[in-house]
Amino acid sequence: LVDQNTRELVDEDIAWADFVLVSAMVIHREEVARLAERCHEQARPLIGGGPLFHAETDTPLGVDHVVVGEAEEVAADLVADMRRGRVRPRYEATRYPDLGLTPQPRWDLAHLEDYATMSVQSCRGCPFDCEFCDVVVLNGRKPRYKSPDQFVGELETLRDLGWRGPVFVVDDNFVGNRRRCRELLRAVIDWRARTGARMTFL
C-alpha cells in the first residue's frame, strides 16, 4: 500500500504487483494519468476507483478497468475476476452497501508515522442537497450507519496499532440523526473511560 500523498511510488512497487489499484479524487486526475503511463510501461493493468471515476467514467485517463460507486458492492466480483485473469472493463455498484457489513480498514498496511491524523467514518449519505456538495451523487440521500460497537471497534484497532494522535471523523453528516449521534458519542465516552484512551476527535 502506497499513499502518494506521503510517499513516492517507485518502479519496484509496480513491478511487484499483478494488478495496480488506485483510489483517486478529482484533484488527482493528472497524477492518475501519469500512473497509467508508468503501469503500461511495465505491462501492469491499472484498476481505478474513487470519486474521480464517478465524475469521469467516459474518460478513464489510461486506466484499464474502472470501479464506479462504493467498492463493497463489487469487490468480491472484482477479486474473483482478477484471480481468473478475466477482469471486465467496468464494475458499477447498483446500490448503496450496508455499512454494518463493511470490514474494518486495513490500517496495519499503512505507515501510521506518516500521518498527523487518522480518518474514521461512522456514516455515509446525507438527506440534504446543498449545491456545493456532491455527497448525494456519490453516497446517496439516505444516511447509512455503522453501529456504535462497530465504530468503537475501529478506534480500538487504531489504538492497538499504537495510534495516539488525533482522529478525523469524515462522515458525510455526523449530526444529521441526533439520536443516533448521541448513542455513538455515549459509546465513545464509555470506551474512553474504560480504556483510558485519550484520542482527540476532529
Describe these PLM feature segments.
Residues 1-100:
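Glycine-rich beta-alpha loop elements in corrinoid/cobalamin-binding modules
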Residues 103-202:
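Radical SAM [4Fe-4S] cluster-binding motif and immediate context
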